[in-house]
């Protein structure tokens, strides 16, 4: 027997998805840095988001691999989008990143952020950054603070 979702629950899921899409579209429209870096939003849902970019020669450091800030920026953007999908204006208060594999020019990176835990005021997120071969090239963890403001009311 297949479990069924109650009609009211389906409506709630659809509403949460639409809110997530609206919030992220609004944030991306104002995010000139992410646009300049060539980032794209590839997936959005309640408390999750994925972003993508292709590493260009201008993004490499003196060792010929991508500067750590490239993966960090991509992961941080996915994190920001994911933790704002519930509609509250939410800000990063702590994050860290590990780079288990090199990133080279031409790599297409996808950062996928997911909520690991939530409280009334804090959200804890994990972001995996993978290359086009599916290899994890960066692991990011972030803590976010939920303000009292909602999207559309920010100053």
Language-model segments: residues:
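Terminal targeting signals and extreme-terminal segments of soluble enzymes
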Residues: 1-155
